[in-house]
């Protein structure tokens, strides 16, 4: 399996090698009458600096997550609004006691040399949807979102995003904002990295990656991928397979790598390298 994208110093200082965390498996006896429907869980760790949200097996999540600084700016409050019941653990509460599909959890900031995940979301084996908004205007403590198997959709927003989103297996659609990282995983994924200064990797499968403002690092990995740079100085990697790369405007670097690739530089002073294979290389 291909390597996932990594953060770079100073903003992306922490190298991420994130695996999908084990999902909670509820204990139930087949055929037991009146068995309780398993719920998602939200709980801050005992050191108060990281919130973990876990879906139950078999759930379809449609979650909206908002991150905002506490009044004294010493921590972050995450409000998670889903369509499934959530069990509120340590440092989490229901804003409306009658609605157990929405929780608010507060984590305390820590003094760390490197960026760290203040929120870890592990969704499960269905077609899930997550909308994440970072309203903290910082990305040192970021969100790490694993969508799990299934055809999932994630959308990140905010002046600064900074989230790390992993699609895992399935045909996923990932949209990340400024400073966001994305990894499609196995499947035919679509990754929109238009916020600026993004790192995105498609993973195994025939993927489509699109850049936007500022510089992007976009890699297709295994499969026949199509990659579009944006308006900045982008670096595009095709990976294994017959790939098509479009630099568009800006001084771009395009690397087809192995396979019969097509590289189109677009306006700007571009560097084009087809790699092994029967390649088509065109510079405007």
Which residues does each PLM region occupy?
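Acidic, glycine-rich low-complexity repeat segments characteristic
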Residues: 73-119, 216, 261, 267-284
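Residues at the loop-to-beta-strand transition
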Residues: 127, 136, 143, 151, ...
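Secretory targeting and sorting signals
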Residues: 1-35
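Consensus positions within tandem repeat domains that build extended binding/scaffold surfaces
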Residues: 127, 151, 171, 188, ...
């Amino acid at each position: 399996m291909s390597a996932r994208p990594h953060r770079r110093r100073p903003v992306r200082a922490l190298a991420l090698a994130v695996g999908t965390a084990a999902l909670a498996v509820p204990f139930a006896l087949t055929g037991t009458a009146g068995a309780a429907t398993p719920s998602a869980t939200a709980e801050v760790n005992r050191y108060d600096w990281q919130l973990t949200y876990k879906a139950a097996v078999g759930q379809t999540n449609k979650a909206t997550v908002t991150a905002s600084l506490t009044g004294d700016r010493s921590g972050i409050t995450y409000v998670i609004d889903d369509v499934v019941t959530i069990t509120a653990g340590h440092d989490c509460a229901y804003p409306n006691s009658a609605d157990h599909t929405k929780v608010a959890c507060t984590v305390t900031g820590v003094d760390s040399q490197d960026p760290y995940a203040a929120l870890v979301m592990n969704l499960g084996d269905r077609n899930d949807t997550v909308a994440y908004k970072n309203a903290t205007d910082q990305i040192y403590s970021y969100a790490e979102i694993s969508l799990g198997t299934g055809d999932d959709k994630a959308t990140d927003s905010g002046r600064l995003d900074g989230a790390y989103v992993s699609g895992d297996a399935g045909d996923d659609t990932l949209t990340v904002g400024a400073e966001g990282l994305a990894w499609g995983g196995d499947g035919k994924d679509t990754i929109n990295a238009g916020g600026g200064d993004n790192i995105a990797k498609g993973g195994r499968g025939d993927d489509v990656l699109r850049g936007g403002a500022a510089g992007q690092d976009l890699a297709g990995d295994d499969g026949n991928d199509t990659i579009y740079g944006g308006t900045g100085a982008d670096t595009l990697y095709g990976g294994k397979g017959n790939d098509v790369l479009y630099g568009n405007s800006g001084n771009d670097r395009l690397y087809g790598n192995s396979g019969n690739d097509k590289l189109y530089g677009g306006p700007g002073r571009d560097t084009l390298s087809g790699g092994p294979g029967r390649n088509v290389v065109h510079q405007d």
